[in-house]
Regions:
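Active-site nucleotide-donor binding segment shared across nucleotidyl transfer reactions
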Residues: 47-99, 221-272
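Eukaryotic intrinsically disordered, low-complexity regulatory regions enriched in Ser/Thr/Pro
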Residues: 204-207, 362, 366-370, 376-448
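Long C-terminal interaction/binding lobes of large macromolecular proteins
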Residues: 142, 171-174, 199, 375-378, ...
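Short, conserved charged micro-motifs
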Residues: 99-106, 272-279
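Arg/Lys-rich, intrinsically disordered low-complexity tails that mediate electrostatic binding
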Residues: 448-498
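N-terminal regions immediately upstream of nucleotidyltransferase
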Residues: 1-49, 156-223, 421, 442-454, ...
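Phosphate-handling catalytic interfaces
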Residues: 149-173, 331-354
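Conserved catalytic core of two-metal-ion nucleotidyltransferases
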Residues: 107-148, 280-327
Length: 498
C-alpha cells in the first residue's frame, strides 16, 4: 500500500504499491518529455514541407502504408492512437521497388533545397530508412510484386493515401503476439491496438456452408498422417487444431464445422523428417502413390512449405517457420499434442488471404478466424489448456539483433567487391544525394597535365637556359673589355704621332 502522506494524484488508487506509484510517475515524465521533443520538431518551419513531400510521393507512387500510421488512419477520431498536434507521424510503407524509391525520394528532398539527407539500409534486410535534417521521415520496406499488388487491391484509401486493410493489420499484430521469443515488451501496446481494430472491424462472416467444397481425407490416411506428425512433435494449426478449439464453441451445433478434415496443416523445423516418417507409415499401410511438392516462401508472409498428395489428393501441408510461433501442449487420448495458439493460427489464416491460390478458401478462412475470436471472447479469460494465449514454448528460429548483425557482417565480407551494385545496396545502402552529386562532378573533371614538348633537332642538344644567360653576360663583358683596349691603343697611337 502507498503511504498516506504521498501527495501525488497518480497514487490515489489503493492497490498501488509505493514502487508502482514511482513507476507511474516515471512513465508520465517519459511521456511528457517525448511530447516536448515532438513539439520541437513539429514547430520546425520546414517540417510541414518535409511531410508534404513525403505524402505526395506516397500518393503518386501508390505505395501502401502499414503499422501504426495505418492503424491510426482506419480508426475513428475518438480512438486514434496518434495526435496530429503532439506526435511526429511515423510513415512505414511497402514498395515493390524499395531501394530505388528510397533513392528517388532522397533526390526529391535534395532538389527541394534540403541538404542533410540520408537514405540507408535498416537492420532488417529490404527495409530502408530515410532521414531529412536528422529527422526520421520514413521506413520503406520491400514487398514482392504479387503480394504488393494484392495489398494495393485490398488497401483502404484515406485522402489519396493507401493503407493496409484491417485484416492485414490484425495479421501483423497476431504475428507479433504469437512470437513469445521476440520483443515481448511491445505486447501491451500491440494488444491494445489489436483490440481497437477488432472493435471497429470484427469478423462478420456467417459461416454458412463453409464445408461445401470440402473433400475429407480417408480415415486411415488421416490417422496415419496425424500420428506421424505427433511422433515428430509438429505443431497443428489446420482443421485438426480447429477441432480442439471447436469444443468451446457456443452454441453447440457449431462444433461440427470441423469434423470433415480437409487436410492436415502443421509447423515443423524439420519438415523433411516428417515427410519421411509419413511415407514410411503410409507404406506400412500399403499406400504407395505418394507425391511431395515444394512451395517457396512468399516474401515474409508465408513460409516455405511442402504439399503431400496421396493418390493425387492433397492430404497435408507442412510449413517450415522462419520465425518463432507459440503453441500449447495438450493431452489427447494420452498423447502430448502440440496445438498452435489462437494468435499463431490467426497470423497464418489471415496471411493466406493474400496468397490468391485455390487451396485457400477465403470465406472458410474468415469463418475459422471468427470462431477463434468468439471462442476466446466466450472463454472468460480461462487461459488454460488450448485456450492459453500468451505463452511459451514457440516453434521456429528467433533472429535476435545480434544474429542479424552477424548475418550482415558475413554479407559485407561476401559482397565487399560488389560495392555500388543493387545486391550490395540492399544490405548496405548509404545514399546522400549531395555527396553523390560531388562524386559525379569529380568523376567528370578532366585532369590537365603539363604539356611536354618533343625536342626538335635544333633544340635537342641546346645548353640549359640558365647557362646560356650566364654565357651571354660573359660575352658582353668580354666584348666591353676588347673595346676599352682598342680605344686605349688608338689613344696611345695618336699620342705618339703628336
Amino acid at each position: 500500500m502507498v503511504n498516506e502522506n504521498v501527495k501525488n494524484k497518480l497514487c490515489v488508487k489503493d492497490h498501488l504499491t509505493f514502487e508502482d506509484c514511482e513507476m507511474a510517475i516515471l512513465r508520465l515524465a517519459i511521456k511528457e518529455n517525448a511530447k516536448v521533443d515532438a513539439e520541437k520538431v513539429l514547430k520546425n518551419p520546414n517540417f510541414n514541407k518535409m511531410l508534404s513531400i513525403l505524402t505526395n510521393f506516397i500518393r503518386r507512387k501508390k505505395l501502401v502504408c502499414y503499422g501504426g500510421i495505418a492503424i491510426n488512419a482506419v480508426l475513428p477520431d475518438e480512438d486514434k492512437i496518434y495526435s496530429t498536434e503532439t506526435d511526429i507521424p511515423d510513415y512505414d510503407f511497402f514498395s515493390s521497388n524499395a531501394l530505388d524509391d528510397a533513392k528517388e525520394l532522397a533526390d526529391i528532398y535534395y532538389k527541394e533545397g534540403f541538404q542533410n539527407i540520408e537514405a540507408k539500409s535498416g537492420v532488417h534486410v529490404g527495409t530502408f530508412k530515410l532521414f531529412v535534417d536528422y529527422v526520421a521521415m520514413a521506413d520503406i520496406s520491400y514487398m514482392p510484386v504479387p503480394l504488393f499488388n494484392m495489398l494495393q487491391k485490398q488497401a483502404v484509401n484515406v485522402d489519396g493515401i493507401l493503407y493496409t486493410d484491417p485484416n492485414y493489420l490484425k495479421m501483423a499484430m497476431a504475428l507479433e503476439l504469437s512470437n513469445s521469443a521476440g520483443d515481448v515488451t511491445r505486447w501491451e501496446k500491440v494488444f491494445k491496438r489489436y483490440k481497437l481494430i477488432e472493435k471497429y472491424y470484427p469478423f462478420k462472416t456467417k459461416c454458412n456452408d463453409v464445408n461445401r467444397n470440402i473433400h475429407p481425407i480417408a480415415d486411415n490416411i488421416y490417422e496415419t498422417i496425424k500420428n506421424a506428425c505427433i511422433d515428430k512433435n509438429a505443431v497443428f494449426l489446420g482443421d485438426y487444431a480447429m477441432s480442439q478449439y471447436s469444443q468451446y464453441i457456443q452454441p453447440h451445433n457449431l462444433r461440427n464445422y470441423f469434423k470433415p478434415v480437409a487436410d492436415i496443416d502443421v509447423l515443423s523445423e524439420e519438415p523433411e523428417e516428417i515427410i519421411e516418417r509419413i511415407k514410411e507409415m503410409l507404406n506400412n499401410e500399403g499406400i504407395q502413390n505418394i507425391k511431395v511438392l515444394k512451395h517457396d516462401a512468399l516474401g515474409e508472409l508465408v513460409p516455405m512449405s511442402y504439399q503431400i498428395l496421396v493418390n493425387n489428393d492433397t492430404c497435408a501441408y507442412i510449413y517450415k517457420p522462419f520465425r518463432c510461433h507459440n503453441y500449447n501442449v495438450i493431452d489427447v487420448n494420452h498423447q502430448h499434442v502440440n496445438i498452435a495458439t489462437i494468435d499463431t493460427i490467426l497470423s497464418f489464416y489471415l496471411a493466406f488471404l493474400y496468397i490468391n491460390k485455390p487451396q485457400y478458401d477465403t470465406e472458410r478462412l474468415m469463418c475459422m478466424c471468427k470462431i477463434l475470436v468468439d471462442v476466446y471472447n466466450q472463454s472468460n479469460l480461462a487461459n488454460n489448456g488450448v485456450l492459453k494465449r500468451f505463452e511459451l514454448p514457440c516453434i521456429g528460429p528467433q533472429h535476435t539483433l545480434s544474429d542479424m548483425k552477424k548475418e550482415k557482417n558475413s554479407k559485407f565480407i561476401e559482397l565487399k567487391g560488389k560495392k555500388g551494385t543493387k545486391e550490395y545496396d540492399m544490405y548496405f545502402l548509404n545514399y546522400n544525394p549531395g555527396q553523390q552529386q560531388e562524386k559525379e562532378i569529380n568523376s567528370h573533371v578532366v585532369q590537365i597535365k603539363p604539356r611536354t614538348r618533343t625536342p626538335s633537332r635544333s633544340t635537342s642538344n641546346k645548353t640549359p637556359f640558365s647557362k646560356r644567360v650566364l654565357r651571354t653576360k660573359r660575352r658582353r663583358v668580354a666584348s666591353r673589355n676588347k673595346t676599352y683596349k682598342h680605344k686605349a691603343r688608338k689613344l696611345s697611337f695618336f699620342g705618339k704621332r703628336l
